[in-house]
Amino acid sequence: MGSCVSRDLFTSAHKNCPMPQGADPLNPDLPSGRTPTVAPDCVIGKDKQMDFCWDPWQRCFQTTNGYLSDSRSRPGNYNVAALATSSLVGVVQSIKDHITKPTAMARGRVAHLIEWKGWSAQPAGWELSPAEDEHYCCLPDELREARFAAGVAEQFAITEATLSAWSSLDEEELHPENSPQGIVQLQDLESIYLQDSLPSGPSQDDSLQAFSSPSPSPDSCPSPEEPPSTAGIPQPPSPELQHRRRLPGAQGPEGGTHPPGSLPSMDSGSLWEEDEVFYN
């Protein structure tokens, strides 16, 4: 394929046509009876003048009225500009078929999910009425895109609010001393735990012994003058002894630590330390 040359540069191309071998160049002094020999590839005449399209195979000439094929060219020849135009049209159509249309379809599916599945936060229900569906179908593309963008922005706002709420909850869990509600809840838990830990081992043993002891006979009843013997009846622990047992690390009545069988009671300070270790 050759490249077309501008018409302005070759307006007088017929004056410089190549001459065949053995022919003399044009001379104004030639007699009128002798006709000059002209090359067959050159057209002389102002009315027949045409733009010269240089091609190595001499396949095309471009005139002011259109395209004119050379007499020696075959009928299956084509023009470069027409080929380029058709190729460009084909490329554009391929882009529309394979890129633009699938993208538009995917965007339309997302918009339909937002509008029809109730993602735009309608409190009445998840399904829209048929009238609203028809109204959405009749909307132009600009309004659909606007509603789609509004739905996406709304979803982003909802997600951001949810994440901020989660982050605030995490901060409250990491720093429970800053929240008064957490302190009240911890105090309630401490009181419940202390109430559950009050019935200790000796008191339970006393109740078992009281249920298992036989009923006293009338012969064994003490006389009114004699004081009742308290040798076999265990005495309940005094309040001071109970208070000492509640404190962690407190000594017993003899100054020693708690026996291994007794259940040590927990105070508020130890519970607070356990909560801090758990949260950290």
From Swiss-Prot:
Chain positions covered by the region annotation Disordered: 195-280
Gene assigned in the entry: FAM131C
Biased composition (Pro residues): 215-227
Top-level taxon of the source organism: Eukaryota
Name recorded for this polypeptide: Protein FAM131C
Biased composition (Polar residues): 197-211
Entry's family note: Belongs to the FAM131 family.
